[in-house]
Amino acid sequence: MKHFIHLLLILTILLPVHARGLSFDPNLIISDNDFFNKNDMSSEEIQRFLQKKGSALAEHTTTNSQGQNYSAADAIWNAANTYHLNPKVLLVLLQKEQSLIENPQPTKDSLDWATGYGVC
């Protein structure tokens, strides 16, 4: 019995473990339904996410052409709804292009070129 336990222990350690997760398809990173789900996050949820990440965008406000101030979270939400995109897609883009989600002190250039397209 003792030899059987040792053999079982050795086989358990030496045999490769096969992961039983979902397989990755490089041609389908995100589904169309997820990508275009504009209602996935509210403006308030975006704001909480930015605050949780310590993003400078959590405190960033800007003024629109009518002279109204609005938050970065509102800007993200409005863009997502206008263009029928998941707000998470825009959050990923902001992080990918200028690290604006996790950067507590972005430069003016980083903000101006937030999504890879500049404000000139």
Model-derived regions: residue spans:
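Short, solvent-exposed loop/turn and secondary-structure capping segments
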Residues: R20-G21, N103-K108
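Sec-dependent signal peptide recognition
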Residues: K2-I10
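Substrate-binding/active-site groove segments that recognize
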Residues: T107-C120
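Long, contiguous hydrophobic alpha-helical segments, chiefly transmembrane helices and signal peptides
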Residues: I46, L90-K96, T115-Y117
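N-terminal export signals and maturation junctions of secreted/periplasmic proteins
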Residues: A19-A73
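Short, functionally critical alpha-helical segments immediately adjacent to catalytic or ligand/cofactor-binding
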Residues: D74-I101
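Hydrophobic h-region of N-terminal signal peptides that target proteins for export
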Residues: L11-H18
